[in-house]
Regions:
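A beta-strand edge to alpha-helix "cap/lid" segment located at domain peripheries
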Residues: 21-25, 29, 85-175
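Short, low-complexity N-terminal intrinsically disordered segments enriched in polar/charged residues
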Residues: 4-52, 163-175
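A solvent-exposed, acidic/Ser-Thr-rich amphipathic alpha-helical stretch
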Residues: 47-103, 108
Length: 175
Protein backbone atom coordinates (compact mmCIF):
# COMPACT_ATOMS: atom_id res chain seq x y z
CA UNK A 1 0.00 0.00 0.00
CA UNK A 2 2.87 2.36 0.82
CA UNK A 3 4.37 1.66 -2.61
CA UNK A 4 1.14 2.61 -4.39
CA UNK A 5 0.85 5.79 -2.35
CA UNK A 6 4.48 6.66 -3.13
CA UNK A 7 3.98 6.05 -6.86
CA UNK A 8 0.82 8.18 -6.88
CA UNK A 9 2.62 10.95 -5.00
CA UNK A 10 5.50 10.90 -7.49
CA UNK A 11 3.11 10.97 -10.46
CA UNK A 12 1.03 13.82 -9.06
CA UNK A 13 4.10 15.79 -7.96
CA UNK A 14 5.83 15.16 -11.30
CA UNK A 15 2.82 16.31 -13.30
CA UNK A 16 2.38 19.38 -11.10
CA UNK A 17 6.04 20.26 -11.49
CA UNK A 18 5.83 19.79 -15.27
CA UNK A 19 2.87 22.15 -15.44
CA UNK A 20 4.47 24.68 -13.10
CA UNK A 21 7.72 24.79 -15.06
CA UNK A 22 6.10 24.44 -18.50
CA UNK A 23 8.08 21.41 -19.57
CA UNK A 24 5.28 20.09 -21.76
CA UNK A 25 7.16 18.91 -24.88
CA UNK A 26 4.31 19.85 -27.21
CA UNK A 27 4.16 23.39 -25.79
CA UNK A 28 7.95 23.73 -26.13
CA UNK A 29 7.73 22.65 -29.77
CA UNK A 30 4.94 25.16 -30.47
CA UNK A 31 6.92 27.99 -28.84
CA UNK A 32 9.94 27.16 -31.00
CA UNK A 33 7.74 27.09 -34.11
CA UNK A 34 6.28 30.51 -33.28
CA UNK A 35 9.75 32.01 -32.74
CA UNK A 36 10.93 30.51 -36.05
CA UNK A 37 7.92 31.96 -37.89
CA UNK A 38 8.61 35.46 -36.58
CA UNK A 39 12.24 34.98 -37.69
CA UNK A 40 11.00 33.98 -41.17
CA UNK A 41 9.10 37.27 -41.40
CA UNK A 42 12.20 39.22 -40.35
CA UNK A 43 14.31 37.41 -42.94
CA UNK A 44 11.79 37.92 -45.78
CA UNK A 45 10.99 34.20 -46.05
CA UNK A 46 7.18 34.21 -45.68
CA UNK A 47 6.77 31.13 -47.88
CA UNK A 48 8.24 29.05 -45.04
CA UNK A 49 5.34 30.00 -42.78
CA UNK A 50 2.70 28.81 -45.22
CA UNK A 51 3.33 25.07 -44.63
CA UNK A 52 2.02 25.58 -41.09
CA UNK A 53 -1.20 27.27 -42.23
CA UNK A 54 -4.43 25.36 -42.82
CA UNK A 55 -5.54 24.82 -46.42
CA UNK A 56 -9.20 24.51 -45.43
CA UNK A 57 -10.04 26.87 -42.59
CA UNK A 58 -8.21 30.17 -42.18
CA UNK A 59 -8.84 33.57 -40.66
CA UNK A 60 -6.07 36.15 -40.34
CA UNK A 61 -7.13 39.51 -38.89
CA UNK A 62 -4.89 42.53 -38.42
CA UNK A 63 -6.47 45.43 -36.54
CA UNK A 64 -6.64 48.98 -37.87
CA UNK A 65 -7.54 50.91 -40.99
CA UNK A 66 -4.48 50.87 -43.24
CA UNK A 67 -2.86 48.81 -46.00
CA UNK A 68 -1.96 46.02 -43.55
CA UNK A 69 -5.30 45.78 -41.76
CA UNK A 70 -8.25 43.62 -42.65
CA UNK A 71 -9.09 39.94 -42.73
CA UNK A 72 -7.83 37.18 -44.99
CA UNK A 73 -9.39 33.73 -45.41
CA UNK A 74 -7.02 31.97 -47.83
CA UNK A 75 -3.32 31.16 -48.00
CA UNK A 76 -2.70 33.11 -51.22
CA UNK A 77 -3.98 36.35 -49.67
CA UNK A 78 -2.05 35.68 -46.47
CA UNK A 79 1.18 35.15 -48.40
CA UNK A 80 0.61 38.41 -50.32
CA UNK A 81 0.02 40.13 -46.95
CA UNK A 82 3.31 38.82 -45.50
CA UNK A 83 5.13 39.98 -48.65
CA UNK A 84 3.54 43.41 -48.24
CA UNK A 85 4.79 43.61 -44.64
CA UNK A 86 8.30 42.86 -45.91
CA UNK A 87 8.00 45.50 -48.63
CA UNK A 88 6.57 48.36 -46.56
CA UNK A 89 8.67 47.72 -43.42
CA UNK A 90 11.75 45.98 -44.88
CA UNK A 91 13.89 46.20 -41.73
CA UNK A 92 11.19 45.03 -39.30
CA UNK A 93 12.49 42.97 -36.35
CA UNK A 94 10.55 41.26 -33.58
CA UNK A 95 11.52 40.78 -29.98
CA UNK A 96 9.25 38.08 -28.60
CA UNK A 97 8.63 39.03 -24.97
CA UNK A 98 6.35 36.14 -23.98
CA UNK A 99 4.70 33.08 -25.48
CA UNK A 100 1.95 31.19 -23.71
CA UNK A 101 0.57 27.91 -25.05
CA UNK A 102 -2.66 26.30 -23.87
CA UNK A 103 -4.27 23.06 -24.95
CA UNK A 104 -3.20 20.05 -26.93
CA UNK A 105 -2.70 19.30 -30.62
CA UNK A 106 -6.42 19.17 -31.44
CA UNK A 107 -7.06 22.71 -30.17
CA UNK A 108 -4.08 24.88 -29.24
CA UNK A 109 -4.16 28.55 -28.30
CA UNK A 110 -0.91 30.49 -28.61
CA UNK A 111 -0.56 33.99 -27.19
CA UNK A 112 2.63 35.70 -28.36
CA UNK A 113 3.54 39.16 -27.08
CA UNK A 114 6.15 41.09 -29.02
CA UNK A 115 7.81 44.40 -29.73
CA UNK A 116 8.38 45.26 -33.39
CA UNK A 117 11.14 47.71 -34.29
CA UNK A 118 12.84 49.18 -37.34
CA UNK A 119 13.99 52.49 -38.76
CA UNK A 120 11.65 54.11 -41.22
CA UNK A 121 13.04 55.49 -44.47
CA UNK A 122 13.14 59.02 -43.04
CA UNK A 123 15.40 57.75 -40.23
CA UNK A 124 12.67 57.84 -37.60
CA UNK A 125 12.66 54.87 -35.21
CA UNK A 126 9.58 52.65 -35.31
CA UNK A 127 8.49 50.70 -32.23
CA UNK A 128 5.20 48.96 -31.71
CA UNK A 129 4.07 46.49 -29.08
CA UNK A 130 1.50 43.89 -29.96
CA UNK A 131 0.11 40.45 -29.43
CA UNK A 132 -0.86 37.52 -31.63
CA UNK A 133 -3.62 35.11 -30.65
CA UNK A 134 -3.09 32.03 -32.81
CA UNK A 135 -5.30 28.94 -32.89
CA UNK A 136 -3.74 25.68 -34.10
CA UNK A 137 -5.49 22.42 -34.95
CA UNK A 138 -3.31 19.39 -35.55
CA UNK A 139 -0.24 21.48 -36.30
CA UNK A 140 -1.91 23.93 -38.68
CA UNK A 141 -2.76 27.55 -37.92
CA UNK A 142 -6.44 28.21 -38.51
CA UNK A 143 -6.85 31.61 -36.87
CA UNK A 144 -4.63 34.64 -36.28
CA UNK A 145 -5.87 37.69 -34.41
CA UNK A 146 -3.17 40.39 -34.38
CA UNK A 147 -3.48 43.45 -32.18
CA UNK A 148 -1.04 46.35 -32.02
CA UNK A 149 -1.07 50.13 -31.70
CA UNK A 150 -2.87 50.93 -34.94
CA UNK A 151 -1.88 54.61 -34.79
CA UNK A 152 1.79 53.62 -34.76
CA UNK A 153 1.26 51.32 -37.76
CA UNK A 154 -0.63 53.98 -39.72
CA UNK A 155 2.00 56.62 -38.96
CA UNK A 156 4.80 54.28 -40.01
CA UNK A 157 3.03 53.45 -43.25
CA UNK A 158 2.44 57.15 -43.97
CA UNK A 159 6.17 57.87 -43.50
CA UNK A 160 7.09 54.99 -45.80
CA UNK A 161 4.59 56.17 -48.41
CA UNK A 162 6.00 59.71 -48.30
CA UNK A 163 9.47 58.19 -48.81
CA UNK A 164 8.33 56.42 -51.98
CA UNK A 165 6.93 53.02 -50.94
CA UNK A 166 3.57 53.38 -52.66
CA UNK A 167 2.31 50.00 -51.42
CA UNK A 168 2.22 51.49 -47.91
CA UNK A 169 -1.09 53.10 -48.94
CA UNK A 170 -2.38 50.33 -51.20
CA UNK A 171 -5.84 48.86 -50.66
CA UNK A 172 -6.15 46.23 -47.96
CA UNK A 173 -5.47 42.65 -48.92
CA UNK A 174 -8.67 40.89 -47.95
CA UNK A 175 -10.43 37.71 -48.96
Amino acid sequence: MKTIALVLFILVFGMSAALAFDVNPYHKMVKKLVRNNFKSIEEHRPEEIMDGVSDKTLEHSFAGDNSLSGTRHDKESLLRWFKRVNKVLPELKFEITDIQVKGGPSNTLVIARWTATCHLLNGEPYENKGVHFITLKWGKAIKFDVYENTKVVSHGLEVQYQAGILEAKAPKIES
